[in-house]
Amino acid sequence: MTKGILGKKVGMTQIFTESGEFIPVTVIEATPNVVLQVKTVETDGYEAVQVGFDDKREVLSNKPAKGHVAKANTAPKRFIREFKNIEGLEVGAELSVEQFEAGDVVDVTGTSKGKGFQGVIKRHGQSRGPMAHGSRYHRRPGSMGPVAPNRVFKNKRLAGRMGGNRVTVQNLEIVQVIPEKNVILVKGNVPGAKKSLITIKSAVKAAK
C-alpha cells in the first residue's frame, strides 16, 4: 500500500549518526493531512484519496469549498491533492508523519525554483565559445541546424524561461521522523524554495 503526505519545505541542515557519519538532510514539516474525499470506481471512475493540507481563513474560501471540507469536519485547506493506492481511510481521517519510518524510501515532488529568462549555458549546461577577441560567438546557442530544411527543428535547445517546473526526485531515504514536531528528515536535497509545497509518497521504483 502506498504511503503519502503533503508538507512544507523548511530548509536544509545536517545530522550525525551514532557512528559519526555526516548526513545532509532536508527538513520537511508535514502537519496532519485531512481526508476530504474518498473516490471510487463506481462514482468517479478511479480510486483515490483526496487530502487537504494547511488551514486557511474561511473568508478566503467560497461556499462550495466550505461545503466540501465541512463533510470532513475541518477548516478550509490551502492545498488539496490526491493519492492513489491508499486503502482503509474514511472522510475526516488524518494522515500524519507517523506512517513513515527511518529507512523508508520515498519519491519527493515539488516546484523547482524559478530562475527567469536564462541563456543556454545556464539553462542547458552547454559549453561557451572561444573567449578570444577574434571569436564570432561566446555564449550564443550555436548552430541552428543544416541548410536543407530551411527551418529550426523542434526541441532545439535555446534560451528561455528556466525553473518553476514540477520536479520529482526518486528514491530518497528518510533519515528520521519526529512525530511531536510533525517533521520528516529526508536525505539529500529536494526541489523547491523554503515554505513551498512538497509531496512525499512511497517510491515507485524502490529496490525490493
UniProtKB/Swiss-Prot annotation:
MF annotations from Gene Ontology: rRNA binding; structural constituent of ribosome
Listed GO CC annotations: cytosolic large ribosomal subunit
Alphabetical list of InterPro entries matching this protein: Ribosomal_uL3, Ribosomal_uL3_bac/org-type, Ribosomal_uL3_CS, Transl_B-barrel_sf
Keyword line: Ribonucleoprotein, Ribosomal protein, RNA-binding, rRNA-binding
SUPFAM superfamilies: Translation proteins
Alphabetized Pfam families for the sequence: Ribosomal_L3
Region (Disordered): 116-148
GO biological process: translation
Task of the protein: One of the primary rRNA binding proteins, it binds directly near the 3'-end of the 23S rRNA, where it nucleates assembly of the 50S subunit.
Quaternary structure and interacting proteins, as annotated: Part of the 50S ribosomal subunit. Forms a cluster with proteins L14 and L19.
Protein name: Large ribosomal subunit protein uL3
Source organism: Streptococcus pyogenes serotype M5 (strain Manfredo)
This protein's encoding gene: rplC
